[in-house]
């Protein structure tokens, strides 16, 4: 991981892209931390919880930074729930439009919250969810 040049956020724009391997992700940690601080203040002022959506941003190399500010992770299945458990702190909320029966026990064990897509899903998986003391919800 390359460090920001001099720690000055203005230097990020001067980054020599030829120095970077390709492909790669380039993250301005200073800008990210500034945004996380805004979210943290919003949480304090409004008494809400904010979760990171791992489907959109699953960069586990900066999970410690993100976990200092956010309340947990929103996962879209078993593998994201495993990622959240291993690298991120806080609660794990898992949603899937179609949970697989052979994965649901493990998803329930990893997750604090399960969000279902239909009443049929609730009927199918309710007993397993309750066995692991998951809070449940339905997506509308």
Annotated model-derived regions:
Residues 19-41, 45:
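An N-cap/entry alpha-helix motif that binds or orients negatively charged groups
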Residues 48-140:
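Active-site-proximal beta-alpha core segment in soluble small-molecule metabolic enzymes
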Residues 5-26:
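Generic N-terminal amphipathic, Lys/Arg-enriched alpha-helix
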Residues 7-12, 36-38, 44-57:
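N-terminal glycine-rich anion-binding loops that anchor highly charged ligand groups
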Residues 4-5, 135:
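Intrinsically disordered, low-complexity segments enriched in small/polar residues
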Residues 13-19, 35, 62, 66:
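Glycine-rich phosphate-binding segment of PLP-dependent enzymes
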């Amino acid at each position: 991981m390359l460090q920001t040049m001099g720690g000055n956020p203005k230097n990020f724009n001067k980054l020599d892209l030829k120095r970077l391997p390709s492909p790669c992700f380039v993250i301005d940690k200073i800008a990210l931390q500034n945004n996380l601080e805004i979210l943290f203040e919003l949480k304090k002022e409004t008494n809400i919880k904010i979760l990171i959506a791992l489907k959109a941003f699953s960069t586990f190399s900066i999970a410690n930074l993100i976990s200092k500010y956010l309340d947990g992770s929103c996962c879209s299945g078993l593998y994201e729930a495993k990622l959240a458990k291993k690298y991120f702190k806080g609660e794990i909320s898992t949603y899937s439009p179609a949970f697989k029966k052979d994965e649901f026990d493990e998803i329930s064990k990893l997750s604090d919250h399960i969000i279902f897509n239909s009443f049929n899903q609730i009927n199918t998986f309710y007993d397993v969810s309750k066995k692991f003391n998951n809070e449940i919800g339905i997506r509308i």
